[in-house]
Amino acid sequence: GALNAADVSFDKRGCDKALRRWPDLRVRVAAAVETQAQAGFFHCKGAGRWRGRALKECRVNSRDAGSVRIAFSVEGGRATVVYITQTLVRRDFLRELDRFLGEARP
């Protein structure tokens, strides 16, 4: 079936700080991932790998945080958000994500 907001979970390490700081993010991010899924992730770009799974990334607008960029993986109708940051420039975001994941891309 289609992925919906209820199928979106958050990995503690890369999300907790942002979710605590900006209360509306949990709902906004889950809704954004659902919307992206309905569009076939057309607006998402690749962003490396996490635990052997391909990551996608996109921007999410939030009332509390302004804009954030997220990285998430999708598998079997479920999504896991791995990282949330206010770093919006894609190149800088990827560098920051690489550092977070602890694996440099050549």
Where are the regions a protein language model picked out?
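Arg/Lys-rich, positively charged N-terminal/basic patches that mediate binding to nucleic acids
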Residues: 1-34, 106
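An acidic, glycine-rich, mixed-charge low-complexity segment common to nucleic-acid enzymes
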Residues: 1-9, 43-48, 57, 77, ...
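A short acidic, often aromatic-flanked loop/helix-cap motif at beta-alpha or helix-coil junctions
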Residues: 11-18, 50-51, 68, 90
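Helix-centric, low-specificity signal for extended rod-like, repetitive segments
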Residues: 19-21, 52, 62, 83
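Positively charged, low-complexity intrinsically disordered regions
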Residues: 27, 46, 91-92
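A short, surface-exposed loop/turn module that caps and links secondary-structure elements
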Residues: 34-63
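Enriched for short, Lys/Arg-rich terminal
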Residues: 58-106
